[in-house]
Amino acid sequence: MNVDERSRIGGREKDAGPGKGILKQNQSSQMTSSFLENPGVRIPTRIITKKEVLDGSNTTSRINTSNLQSMVKRRVSFAPDVTLHSFTFVPEQNNEIKEPRRRKTSTNSPTKISSQEEPLVTSTQIDDARTEEKTAAEEDPDTSGMELTEPIVATPDSNKASQHDPTSMEMTEVFPRSIRQKNPDVEGESIESSQQIDDVEAVREETMELTAIHNVHDYDSISKDTVEGEPIDLTEYESKPYVPNSVSRSTGKSSDYSVERSNDKSDLSKSENKTNSSQPMEITDIFHADPQNPMSLHSDNNINNDGNEMELTQIQTNFDRDNHHIDESPSEKHAFSSNKRRKLDTVSDYAASVTTPVKEAKDTSGEDNDGDLEMMEKMSPITFSDVDNKIGTRSNDVFTIEPGTEDTGMQTATDDEEDGENVDDNGNKIVEKTRLPEIDKEGQSGIALPTQDYTLREFINEVGVGFLDTKLIDDLDKKVNFPLNSFNFVENQRIDNVFSAFYIDIPILEVEAFRCKELWRSINESKDKFKDFEAQIDKSHPPLLLQEYFSSDEKMKQLMRDQLQLVKGYSKLEAAMEWYEWRKKQLNGLELILAENLNTLKREYEKLNEEVEKVNSIRGKIRKLNEAIKEEIRSLKNLPSDSYKPTLMNRIKIEAFKQELMEHSISLSSSNDFTQEMRSLKLAIAKKSNDILTLRSEVASIDKKIEKRKLFTRFDLPKLRDTLKILESLTGVRFLKFSKATLSIAFLQLDDLRVDINLANFKNNPLSSMKVMNDSNNDDMSYHLFTMLLKNVEAEHQDSMLSNLFFAMKKWRPLLKYIKLLKLLFPVKITQTEEEEALLQFKDYDRRNKTAFFYVISLVSFAQGVFSENGQIPMKVHISTQQDYSPSREVLSDRITHKISGVLPSFTKSRIHLEFT
């Protein structure tokens, strides 16, 4: 059975699914005898297994990622001569016993180091995987696929081993690196070092309060105590264990080189592939590693050129794990946890390799892992130098280094050593000297001495950049001398005299006090900032500047001191510049105040000068008058008594003076009446004053009741304006303006007739308060109609005058329509009688008889004839003719009724009553 027939049979057996290929061609027409005899067609001779279908097809969800590199040149053609086949779906089988999501890893025995990998399957392929275990063990592990999120363990191609790409990644997995030691001597030293680290771990304290960062050791030597159902949160941080003192770390390049030389490379790679692939990734878990399995460390980014530590994690590929495997004894083989990846919010530029003590099973139960990991994401990067040094200071074992490798490891000293014995007489910390490994020159170039934490105070004292500047203090030689210091002077002077003496100096003292307060505030603010900065440095890792300074030689230290002195001088000049700018602004403000005071004093001085000039002029007049009176008195004393003869002018003045005295005597006699009248006026004034006070109190009480806030804001004006326009269009009344108490409106229904309403008198007399403005542009008909409406409004409904007027206008609106229609038939005009009655006059001309008929009807009668169907309509007619023609009343009634019947159907012949004039 060929492939095409098998696909068609599978399509018929399936209820749902496509029966033909995507290209919609006739498949049966191609299966001819010539087609089968074609030597280029390959017909299968055996049943294709499921594994071959999965490996060879690109239409399934199971993708073989391990063979991607070998299948790069594979091309899939979708030409018209190629047929795409449909496949039946394998139904999921319900098993009575559900396989756990995390399967126990098989321990690696020393006799089966290079055992083959077990194929990975999903939950829908468990039965097939069980039947194919033996087949999968005999085949190449590179052909095994990957299901969903299971870890991928791919062995780098031996032909490409020289590329040494430590950053290549298979799919989206991130793998931690492991180191392989091919030297058998290293294994013995590792076992001995693990025993010492076990003793140290018993007294170590965990450095992280939230989620610990743990070490993942050799993947063939992990503890078997891993709980199968352990929850996994996000991604586990996997790093290397800290090896005390000087630790040999081999780079990925040298490890690849050593692995490439090894003979059992393929066996170890397959064994590790099996171990890693059997651990599915179920999102993440926080993993506590066992510190009793130390191993050689390596890192590509532990120390950069600036000497900064690297924090948190390192990204390592699966190639490094294959190339850095460590062989261990069977007693130290452990099960290993699944690889996990983590996505950090902030990627740190530096990372440090750390390890944490082993916790009990209840500590790693996963109760607080979710919250701890979330907080850990926010708080990273975090330094772990205290954890590193607790191990580093208690262990003296040193691992060896392979020849030809480069060491990039580093050790740190923590603040916990301050309390120990490594402190000198001055209280400074002394870095513990470590025993370096005996390696060649090439390996020695990559080893860094341990670092030490330094405080900001120590750095400032060492460099000599203090904050107290004695030069500035010495320059302040200006002193304020107070003469009140003597005891006798204080006793002899009163307070007003002292105040008067120092009145000018008091503002200067106030300015100086304000200046001192500003300096004091600035100094306190600087102190607080310095304390905060010092606290931040104490709590965090020492800055790069401190590490570089204390790790440099004397020449470099002197250069750094000179640079810091230069920076200090520049900062001091900047601070002085800011201070002088502040002083300048203060002095400018004082100058403005003094200028304002000077102008005020000048104005007062000018006023005083004017007053002095007035006083001097009055004084001069008084002096002259005094001298004249004295001269008159002397002259009168010297003259005899009979020698005085008054002149005519003097006599006239005397008579006038006498008349004035007589008038005053009369008013003096009537002083009682004046007194009584004054009393009555005072009483009236007091009464009016009381009335005013009561009225003011009433006004105040009314004001309290009225809400003071604004009813409308400026944002409400556009909305109110639009509302007013809508009301104008609905009612036909337009508001023109509102000035004082006069409201001007225009009626759209009456050809924009303008009416002014005085709201002050509207309540008392509505009719008189409304004034109709008869402009020349408006039609007289609207004016007379509105006047008629005002007269016809009932007097008893004056309270609702405007509403009644509006309803009447709405009711009489058709009257304008009939008048306009009448204008289309006859020339119409409106006249007014002496009684101010509006008359409607229209003209009818008879061409045959050359006679003109003038009909006159009052506006009220015309309105009654329009709106009512009963009653007589009085109409006057005047005949103007050039011939002797005098038609009868019947003829005129028939004529006028015939002409206006189409416009005014209510004007019938029986209702029209003509009167000849």
Curated annotation (Swiss-Prot):
BP-aspect Gene Ontology terms: homologous chromosome orientation in meiotic metaphase I; kinetochore assembly; mitotic sister chromatid biorientation; mitotic spindle assembly checkpoint signaling; positive regulation of meiosis I spindle assembly checkpoint; protein localization to kinetochore; sister chromatid biorientation
Stretches that traverse the bilayer: none
Pfam families, A to Z: Knl1_RWD_C, Spc7
UniProt note: phenotype after gene disruption: Inviable.
Positions of the UniProt region annotated as Interacts with the BUB1-BUB3 complex: 165-183
Main location: nucleus
Keywords of the record: Centromere, Chromosome, Coiled coil, Kinetochore, Nucleus, Phosphoprotein
Assigned GO CC terms: kinetochore; Knl1/Spc105 complex; mitochondrion; nucleus; outer kinetochore
Residues the record lists as Phosphoserine modifications: 77, 380
Motif (MELT): 146-149, 169-172, 232-235
Polar residues biased stretches: 24-36, 106-126, 156-170, 245-257
Listed Acidic residues bias regions: 414-424
Compartments where located: Nucleus; Chromosome, Centromere, Kinetochore
Statement: the UniProt record of this protein carries the keyword ATP-binding: no
GO MF terms, alphabetically ordered: microtubule binding
Top-level taxon of the source organism: Eukaryota
Region (Disordered): 1-38, 93-172, 235-282, 324-343, 397-427
Modified residues (Phosphothreonine): 149, 172, 235, 356
UniProt function note: Acts as a component of the outer kinetochore KNL1 complex that serves as a docking point for spindle assembly checkpoint components and mediates microtubule-kinetochore interactions. Kinetochores, consisting of a centromere-associated inner segment and a microtubule-contacting outer segment, play a crucial role in chromosome segregation by mediating the physical connection between centromeric DNA and spindle microtubules.
Subunit structure: Component of the KNL1/SPC105 complex composed of SPC105 and KRE28. Part of the outer kinetochore KMN network that includes the KNL1, MIS12 and NDC80 complexes. Interacts (via phosphorylated MELT motifs) with BUB1 and BUB3 in the BUB1-BUB3 complex; the interaction is direct. Interacts with the MIS12 complex subunits MTW1 (via C-terminus) and NSL1 (via C-terminus). Interacts with the NDC80 complex subunits SPC24 and SPC25. Interacts with CNN1 (via N-terminus).
Stored PANTHER family: SPINDLE POLE BODY COMPONENT SPC105
Protein name as annotated: Outer kinetochore KNL1 complex subunit SPC105
